[in-house]
Amino acid sequence: MIEYLSLKKVTDMHRQETDDAVLRVVNSGWYLQGEATKRFEHDFAQYIGTQYCVGCGNGYDALWLIFRAYKELGVMSDGDEVIVPANTFIASILGISDNGLTPVLVEPLLDTLEIVDSKIDEAIPD
């Protein structure tokens, strides 16, 4: 087998720091919405140069929230279409459809698995 990425090596590089962080959270009894979450949200917001950050439990939650926010802000409305690669994970589709939006699947390139501008243009209705 050809090793692609040894996650064990990557993890071992940060073993003590990771173990200490996990132990702090476990000992605090706050697994969600505690000080560690607040600190992460603050630090990550600063890192990416924005004022706010909301930690999410998974990608679906994050996608659901952003599409809901777009609807609340009037950027999107029920039935609006969202173009996604046909090989996307189901959470992408559910985050869209669970907000009353319509996913539009576009076939990706075989060599990169990405969609290209011309395919996006074809998927946009006139």
Q: Which residue stretches match the model-derived regions?
A:
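N-terminal "arm"/small-domain region of PLP-dependent enzymes with the aminotransferase-like
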Residues: 1-30, 35
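Short, solvent-exposed loop/turn segments at secondary-structure junctions
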Residues: 10, 61, 89
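Phosphate-binding glycine-rich loop
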Residues: 30, 35-81, 95-99, 105
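PLP-dependent aminotransferase-like
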Residues: 71-126
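Small/polar loops that bind or transfer phosphate-bearing groups
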Residues: 6, 55, 84
